[in-house]
A protein has these predicted regions:
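N-terminal small-domain helix-loop-helix segment of the aminotransferase-like
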Residues: 5-104, 111, 295-299, 391-400
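Conserved core of the PLP fold type I
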Residues: 62, 66-205, 217-233, 237, ...
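Short amphipathic alpha-helical/adjacent loop interface patches that line ligand
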Residues: 79, 212, 309-310, 382
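PLP-dependent enzyme catalytic core of the Aspartate aminotransferase-like
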Residues: 162, 346-356, 360-400
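Conserved core segment of the aminotransferase class I/II
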Residues: 234-306, 389, 396
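Accessory recognition modules or surfaces
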Residues: 279-280, 284, 306, 332-351, ...
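Conserved glycine-rich beta-strand-loop-beta hairpin in the small C-terminal domain of fold type I
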Residues: 286-293, 305-316, 323-335, 361, ...
Length: 400
């Protein structure tokens, strides 16, 4: 009897099984809609969206002509907006024709991988990773190669990356600021990475591309400068989404940008558009393209987000937790008092506190806090966090 689904879909499901189990079969999944819980799991909004965002949508929803809601691809107006924005934010002279509008960063990553990866090509990604990198590489026909961040510092392990690059390597995916650690990789490390990729490309006679996932690049704290990996390596793809800085992940708009230094840009441009069309029509809806000039100027209150970060970090470390202070993103990585992080997540749930277990992100023994909830939720959670830690100590080392 024939199988109802493809082998590829089976592999994809297997790569996603830890997070799918959490989303569909955990205590959180059964209680997520309860009022009064402290939900620190996913980067969803917990307060009303920025008024400016609602006004932008209202301003552009009214049709100006009969073609207002016609098919949209990489339209000239929003591309021009992004050319100016990228020159401001990245200080790189991107050109409008090298910018490709997508319905979010997930679509952008899928389009880039579909453009450059052939079956059997290897794609390196960094662990602990965002949940979907491995599955997206598999979906493109590639072979995922996992490289862990250096322990304790959570910096890029350039030695391990160097050793992993071989004749089949097609790309390296870097996410900075990094989910889930909040780490911003420093310029010196990115320069060394660029030099390595240039050397490896020369040796093999085949370009090793850098895919720079910069979804959180506008969410940085304490006035830090975000160094874009694209600034250091010619053969790079910049991937971005507005869903994070707007805290509106249900409104899907993002882009791919090619730096002017990239070789073979003309051929890559054509291929990207073709893959966009075949990859489920990976272009943003008309309304979002019209509104992009307004959307690009809007963002959540980063200072407020930093205050919530600081409140959680100070309270948790004072209670006895070990936590990594994030330099960017809206996530904080905290060490579980038990090696079995899923068991500790269940203990937190008894106090109506919900976080993501590190085992879903290939970092067992930790858990991730998303600090997008409001101040009242943060304050209500602190006593429960402290009590759960005391209970874990009282229950002994059975789970540690």
């Amino acid at each position: 009897m024939s199988k109802p689904v493809s082998e590829r879909s089976v592999r994809l499901l297997d790569s996603m099984s830890p997070i799918l189990h959490f989303l569909n079969d955990s205590i959180w999944s059964s209680r997520r809609h309860e009022t009064g819980i402290c939900d620190f799991t996913i980067g969803n909004p917990h307060e009303m969206p920025p008024r400016e965002l609602v006004e932008a949508y209202s301003r552009w929803i009214e049709p100006r002509n009969e073609h207002w809601f016609a098919y949209k691809m990489n339209e000239t107006g929003p591309r021009d907006v992004l050319e100016g924005s990228l020159r401001q934010w990245r200080n790189i002279p991107f050109e409008a024709e090298d910018i490709f509008l997508t319905n979010g960063a997930i679509a952008a990553l899928a389009v880039v991988l579909g453009t450059i990866v052939d079956p059997g090509d290897e794609v390196i990604f960094i662990s602990p990773p965002w949940f979907q990198y491995e599955g997206m590489i598999l979906n493109a026909g590639g072979i995922p190669v996992r490289i862990r961040l250096l322990p304790e510092t959570f910096d890029l392990d350039l030695g391990a990356i160097d050793e992993a690059i071989g004749p089949k390597t097609r790309a390296v995916i870097i996410n900075s600021p990094q989910n889930p650690t909040g780490r911003i990789f420093p310029s010196e490390v990115l320069k060394d990475l660029a030099g390595m990729l240039e050397s490896k490309s020369r040796e093999s006679g085949r370009t090793v591309y850098l895919i720079s996932d910069e979804a959180y690049s506008r969410i940085v704290f304490e006035g830090k400068t975000f160094p874009s990996p694209v600034a250091f390596y010619h053969e790079s793809f910049l991937v971005y989404t507005y869903g994070k800085v707007l805290l509106a992940p249900g409104e899907r708009i993002g882009f791919i940008a090619l730096p002017p230094t990239m070789s073979e840009r003309v051929q890559i441009r054509k291929a990207l558009v073709g893959v966009q069309m075949m990859n489920g029509w990976s272009f943003p809806n008309a309304l979002l393209q019209y509104a992009l000039g307004d959307i690009d100027k809007i963002g959540i209150d980063i200072a407020h987000l930093q205050r919530k970060r600081d409140r959680l970090y100070t309270a948790l470390t004072a209670a006895g937790y070990e936590a990594l202070l994030p330099e960017g993103t809206f996530y904080m990585l905290v060490r579980s008092p038990w090696r079995d992080d899923e068991a500790f997540i269940e203990l937190l749930a008894r106090h109506d506190i919900f976080c993501i277990p590190g085992s879903t992100m290939d970092i067992p023994g930790y858990f991730r806090i998303c600090f997008t909830p409001g101040d009242d939720t943060v304050e209500r959670s602190l006593a429960g966090f402290e009590l759960a830690l005391r209970q874990a100590a009282e229950m002994g080392e059975a789970r540690s």
